């Protein structure tokens, strides 16, 4: 199964981008042994529309353009399900074992994801009740994806 993250906004050069890339590379190395075929990150420029509904619609259209037909969508949303790391790993393993060809995690911009994308998502996931900057959320998501792979591999990285 392929994994992708489609995110609104671009990470600038610096510690966030370096950390995100480190977790992506670590996942690729660990995940390959578990039947995962890599992790791609797609960045989409934020819409410059003045009003929120237009901005969200433009960003949603740009995201949907990158989604293959049979991909499963996971919305990163503050209203989503709060999974612990083991539960998150079990979700990924279950989808892999069901031969889901691709799972795509969607991270909205400053206004969040459009209601249309939230409805299309098979699952909505939250990283707690707090609101996180989308750049920070991307790093946290990539870390959790890597952590999930280490849990599935029996690697000592996860020590809960």
Swiss-Prot record:
Family assignment from sequence similarity: Belongs to the RNA methyltransferase RlmH family.
Subunit: Homodimer.
Function: Specifically methylates the pseudouridine at position 1915 (m3Psi1915) in 23S rRNA.
Subcellular location(s) per record: Cytoplasm
Listed GO CC annotations: cytoplasm
InterPro entries per UniProt: Alpha/beta_knot_MTases, RlmH-like, tRNA_m1G_MTases_N
Class of the enzyme per the UniProt entry, highest EC level: transferase
GO molecular function, one term: rRNA (pseudouridine-N3-)-methyltransferase activity
Protein name as catalogued: Ribosomal RNA large subunit methyltransferase H
NCBIfam families, sorted: PRK00103.2-3, PRK00103.2-5
Chief place where the protein resides: cytoplasm
The entry's keywords: Cytoplasm, Methyltransferase, rRNA processing, S-adenosyl-L-methionine, Transferase
UniProt catalytic activity: pseudouridine(1915) in 23S rRNA + S-adenosyl-L-methionine = N(3)-methylpseudouridine(1915) in 23S rRNA + S-adenosyl-L-homocysteine + H(+)
EC number: 2.1.1.177
CDD domains in the record: RlmH-like (cd18081)
Residues holding S-adenosyl-L-methionine: 108
């Amino acid at each position: 199964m392929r994994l992708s993250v489609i995110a609104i906004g671009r990470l600038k050069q610096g510690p966030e981008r370096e950390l995100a890339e480190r977790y992506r590379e670590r996942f690729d190395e660990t995940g390959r042994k578990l039947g995962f075929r890599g992790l791609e990150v797609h960045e989409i420029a934020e819409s410059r529309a003045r009003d929120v509904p237009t901005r969200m619609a433009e960003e949603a259209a740009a995201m949907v353009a990158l989604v293959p037909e049979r991909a499963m969508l996971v919305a990163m949303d503050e209203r989503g399900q709060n999974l612990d790391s083991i539960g998150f790993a079990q979700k990924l393993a279950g989808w892999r074992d069901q031969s889901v060809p691709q799972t795509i995690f969607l991270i909205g911009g400053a206004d969040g994801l459009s209601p249309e994308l939230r409805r299309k998502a098979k699952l909505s996931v939250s990283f707690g009740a707090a609101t996180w900057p989308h750049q920070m959320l991307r790093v946290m998501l990539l870390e959790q994806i890597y952590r999930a792979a280490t849990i599935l591999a029996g690697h000592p990285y996860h020590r809960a």
